[in-house]
């Protein structure tokens, strides 16, 4: 029996084949990126790349799928190791900082980019690359009790004043809500080519479609 037996019953064989063979690059392996990577891998995606230069800190453990024994190690490497041990998925882990100078090198094989970086410079570099090469790109971000999941053509990069994301309030439930919405938007796009934008608000548990 397949590891993805239940997902396959829900999605159909045709969709599962698409998911397995669709190259996806996730930019960031923090609260959103690591959980999105795990969710996609456990949903049947088999061609994942994760880019993140950061190392695991103790404060990451409540919102990111890492262990105390992982503190100090590269997020992308540990994520790749954990997913291979769990379900045999081989994730291409790149422990590099993405900059405007190396976007082509790091993103060149992507058919879909998921941007969950925590700084505006990297987000802008991803957005510009996706626009220039017409690569589908989904951006997801959080602020207080609000989150957005938005495709590149209508996405606006936030100002640098909000870049110090390590110190802002962050609820795990909002992270996981956003992860679920982002992953469903990704699966829906691959299955149907439809690009759907969403907002998520934790206090009133609302997920709304955005028509931008």
Where are these regions (language model features)?
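N-terminal charged helix/coil linker that caps or initiates catalytic domains
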Residues: 1-25, 141
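Hydrophobic Val/Ile/Leu positions in short beta-strands of Rossmann-like dinucleotide-binding domains
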Residues: 26-29, 50
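Hydrophobic/small residue at the entry helix of a nucleotide-binding pocket
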Residues: 32
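Gly/Ala-rich phosphate-binding loop of Rossmann-like dinucleotide-binding domains
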Residues: 37, 41
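Conserved S-adenosyl-L-methionine
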Residues: 42-47
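Glycine-rich phosphate-binding loop and adjoining beta1-alpha1-beta2 segment
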Residues: 50-86
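A structured beta-alpha segment of the ubiquitous adenosine-cofactor-binding alpha/beta core
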Residues: 74-112, 117-123
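Glycine-rich phosphate/adenylate-binding loop
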Residues: 105-112, 116-212
